[in-house]
Regions:
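C-terminal catalytic "cap/lid" subdomain
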Residues: 1-271
């Protein structure tokens, strides 16, 4: 008989697995299984932009990015849904389950988990999160599963009649909105760099929200780091959540962060 858990919001850890570290995901999967066996409630959100780009290129489809996010026309949206909601999501779930864990793969569409609207028509079908319905997450967590979430979301607000029912929303953004909605203890962003660096390329181990905002305004945080910093700012804006950006390529980076901490860049309220 499967164990039922009583989950307190402040215990939950939200993890964003960046697509750029998928070639090195073996220890991350091991860490997820290890933490689950310790009854650590985890929510895993994944990306996979590089894999989507590969499939688009194989189909001779153009793809462009703006400030670290994909401009998404209808063809790109279909590819994002198929690759992230299908292939990538199920590979991660299969790896966790065959590794001794218990995971369920979903997207932001399932249970109306992530509901959004189009952000900017120039970005195509890229959305902002308007609402998080955590009902399905609660059921999965209390049933002892790790929810593995693909960043495809429900086009629930202000949808023109001919528009798709789906939206592409950045995985960092989704992870942050979930962390904020459930009052997570920590949001951990696993990426392919060891944190945020200053203009002299020195690692910044700890930042206040004000300091992080200054890095965005000055352009020091650029490219793919922009949505990550914005995600951290969202996660810590109204909760006691701590956000950490770490190098997921490092062996057992996730396990080390949860059990000891101290690597990468931490953004938190200090007041």
């Amino acid at each position: 008989m499967n164990k039922q858990l009583t989950i307190k919001p402040g215990e939950i850890i939200v993890v964003k697995l960046g697509g750029s570290i998928f070639d090195n995901k073996d220890t991350t999967i091991e860490d997820v299984v290890s933490l689950q066996k310790q009854d650590k409630p985890l929510v895993l959100v994944h990306g996979g932009a590089n894999i989507v780009t590969k499939w688009l290129n194989q189909n001779n489809a153009k793809t462009d990015f703006f400030q670290g996010e994909r401009i998404t026309d209808r063809a790109a949206l279909e590819m994002v849904t198929a690759v992230l909601g299908g292939l990538v999501n199920k590979e991660i779930v299969a790896a966790i389950n065959t590794g001794g864990g218990r995971a369920v793969g979903i997207s932001g569409v399932d249970g109306s988990l992530i509901q959004g609207r189009i952000r900017d028509k120039n970005m195509g079908y890229v959305g902002n999160v308007v609402k998080v319905d955590q009902s399905l997450l609660t059921v999965l967590l209390e049933s002892g599963f790790v929810p593995v979430i693909a960043p495809v979301s429900l086009h629930a607000f202000d949808r023109p009649e001919a528009s798709p029912l789906l939206l592409n929303i950045n995985g960092d953004t989704i992870a942050a909105e979930i962390a904020a909605a459930i009052g997570a203890d920590k949001l951990i962003l696993l990426t392919d760099v060891n944190g945020i660096h200053d203009e002299s390329s020195r690692l910044l181990p700890c930042l206040s929200p004000t300091e992080a905002e200054a890095l965005l305004a000055s352009g020091v945080a650029s490219g793919g780091m922009i949505p990550k910093v914005k995600a951290c700012l969202r996660a810590v804006s109204s909760t006691a959540t701590t956000c950490v950006i770490i190098d997921g390529r490092r062996k057992h980076a996730l396990l080390d962060e949860v059990t000891a901490g101290g690597s990468g860049t931490t953004i938190k309220n200090t007041g």
